Amino acid sequence: MADRKTPLHMVRNIGIAAHIDAGKTTTSERILFFTGMSHKIGEVHDGAATMDWMEQEKERGITITSAATTCFWKQHQINLIDTPGHVDFTIEVERSMRVLDGAVAVFCSVGGVQPQSETVWRQANKYHVPRIVFVNKMDRIGANFYNVESQIRNRLKANPVPIQIPIGAEDDFKGVIDLVRMKAYVWEDDKKPTDYVEKEIPAELLEKAQEYRAKLIEAVSETDDSLMEKFFSGEELSEEEIKKGIKAGCLRMSIIPMLCGTAFKNKGIQPLLNAVVDYLPAPDEIEAIKGVYEDGTEVTVESTDDGEFAALAFKIMTDPFVGQLTFIRVYRGSLESGSYAYNTVQDSKERIGRLLKMHSNKREEISVLHAGEIGAVVGLKNTLTGDTLASEKDKVILEKMDFPEPVISVAVEPKTKADQEKMAIALQKLAQEDPSFRVNTDEESGQTIISGMGELHLEIIVDRMLREFKVDAEVGQPQVAYRETIRKPVEQEYKYAKQSGGRGQYGHVFLRIEPLEPASGFEFVNDIKGGVVPKEYIPAVEKGCREALQNGVLAGYPVEDVKVTLYDGSYHEVDSSEMAFKLAASMGFKEGARKANPVILEPMMKVEVETPEEYMGDVIGDLNKRRGQVSSMDERNGSKIITAFCPLAQMFGYSTDLRSGTQGRATYSMEFDHYEEVPKNVSEEIIKKRNG
């Protein structure tokens, strides 16, 4: 087997995560440029960035799919996962966070902490991803490094510690002061972008540099007792000790190292790459991933080349030249092309075709993938996003990823009958790639319904059908994913008995139906004593309840946040069957739910609007008209920030209305937050419309 080219401790799996316009793609591009992988720098403005390789991204100038790219810096292998910054694609971010070991969070020096940055930050916290901060666009008017520092502290409740401070800002931004080495790095505009000059710290900035270095030393000393002792006895810490302390704090997430620059003008990228290598973790420096066996036994999977193979499939893509690509992160052991692996989630054996290392949209064929590496496999038949591939000798299942339920649906139909089959194939492929996108058929109307995380999400799906699969589709009005639940506990008996010649049917259940906390889903409890309902019929009772949950009693929407306890019943030696108990439970649940004060729930979106002050009254008035509840008002860079919770049903077409109401000067972001009970008058309308 081929030996590793890069030792495990010199591998970095990192993501670049940011708000939509912080300059993330440009930063990724510059990283590829400076590490020597791409010769002409791609620019998002002219739609040519190497990372943004899907057509729609080039047009919209936003990054949709995380392309995994390998590059090298100072003998270290950096696997760069580009994550999208748009709210409708949080699933992509979530999915890439899952396989990252560290992240570079990019913030705009003017915009600072934006709503999307908070979402991405929360996801990085959830997966314990250590990160460093790069404050980008230091050359823009209004650039303020220190503002961003205080916003990260106050809004993200983190501990940002600058390891650099800027020399100048806006047009006057020249470079950075390295607080570890106490040197200035200056990029001179007439020189090549790869060159920077190391100088002494300018006299007028020396005091500020000393103040920030003192803060850095204090933060570093708290990471280690021996450093703390040195700090208190007034001894100088060496450069090595400071670096060691920054890394320890970064891995524990007690320190977030902060750097700055302007990717567009090629300033600050080399020190950023040095920080990635110096402070972000190697695969063997993070907590081992947890796994389970089929019988529920838990196990930790250490990142090592020894041991049986285990990897996580985190993304599926259709490539126009090689067909389906499955991106995997290898956690343990290694995988050779031409070998076999076992999908422990689908319980099926997979043949490993070719193995590829991706450079944005160019590919390099390799013979083996080692622990800690990320690559793409060609030719997997049954593997879905979130599945585990493992050795047949050790059938471990790595943690599953949580995928959000879609909140918006539209009906789609092809413009020509001939495209019907092509559309079905296209949608199936797209659903395989993206677990937050669902396809189903409406039983009553026979229409194909697609569901996703927001209007933009579904627009891009329809767009991709046209571009990649040449299917032109008509799209219906967006529909909201309502839910139903109950508000009071009830007890319900139901007997299902049929005697009409031959063998009868008999199932008899007593159900206790109770409401649960929001977002708890469904819970089934078997509380049968003394075998009054035999063991073998219990699963049928649960199945009957689960089936009844699919269509609520008010308007046929799925029911959630309900607990059902089977506490009594009876059976018949001859006539009882699984079918009879399933029907008894299903009908009993429906009858009970009618008495349990059923209500309709609707998805509430968290909406954040940034508007010039003169339109603030109009914006709030409009949100109130949409049944929105304003939760906070803030000020950022001279604009007003309004945060509100609004029903999704009232938010269709909001971007057009907001644009025309503010002459295009306001911007907004919207993401699903929670489900909430619908007001009575709206509920009656929904029921009337559904039940015709």
From Swiss-Prot:
GO molecular function, one term: translation elongation factor activity
UniProt binding sites for GTP: 18-25, 82-86, 136-139
Highest taxon above the source species: Bacteria
PROSITE patterns in the record: G_TR_1 (PS00301), G_TR_2 (PS51722)
Keyword entries, A-Z: Cytoplasm, Elongation factor, GTP-binding, Nucleotide-binding, Protein biosynthesis
CDD domains attached to this UniProt entry: EF-G (cd01886), EFG_III (cd16262), EFG_mtEFG1_IV (cd01434), EFG_mtEFG_C (cd03713), EFG_mtEFG_II (cd04088)
SUPFAM superfamilies: EF-G C-terminal domain-like, P-loop containing nucleoside triphosphate hydrolases, Ribosomal protein S5 domain 2-like, Translation proteins
Gene Ontology biological process terms from the UniProt entry: ribosome disassembly
One family name in Pfam for this protein: EFG_IV
Annotated GO CC locations: cytoplasm
Function according to Swiss-Prot or TrEMBL: Catalyzes the GTP-dependent ribosomal translocation step during translation elongation. During this step, the ribosome changes from the pre-translocational (PRE) to the post-translocational (POST) state as the newly formed A-site-bound peptidyl-tRNA and P-site-bound deacylated tRNA move to the P and E sites, respectively. Catalyzes the coordinated movement of the two tRNA molecules, the mRNA and conformational changes in the ribosome.
Family membership: Belongs to the TRAFAC class translation factor GTPase superfamily. Classic translation factor GTPase family. EF-G/EF-2 subfamily.
Protein name: Elongation factor G
Name of the gene encoding the protein in the UniProt record: fusA
